[in-house]
């Protein structure tokens, strides 16, 4: 199975976890997914001051700047596998 196929499968598995991951885990998943699919975050697109959730998500993604698509995919897959081991799938 190719890396892209493994990444796509991991993204599908996230939706089938038995319980919701912690906020920190969700931010990590979001950041790795965005880095793998869109590349580096553009600081000019950072959400406004009052959008706390949007800022947290953007900042988590921005911290992954410079991480290659492949490395982000591998990290995402590893994170999902870790969550499956601790939370299980439905």
UniProtKB/Swiss-Prot annotation:
Binding annotation for an acyl-CoA: 15, 30-34, 53, 57, 76
Pfam families, per the entry: ACBP
Gene3D superfamilies referenced in this protein's UniProt entry, alphabetically: 1.20.80.10
Alphabetic keyword roster: Lipid-binding, Transport
GO molecular function: fatty-acyl-CoA binding
InterPro entries: Acyl-CoA-binding_prot_CS, Acyl-CoA-binding_protein, Acyl-CoA-binding_sf, FERM/acyl-CoA-bd_prot_sf
Domain ACB: 3-89
GO biological process: fatty acid metabolic process
Similarity annotation: Belongs to the ACBP family.
Function: Binds medium- and long-chain acyl-CoA esters with very high affinity and may function as an intracellular carrier of acyl-CoA esters.
Protein name: Acyl-CoA-binding protein homolog
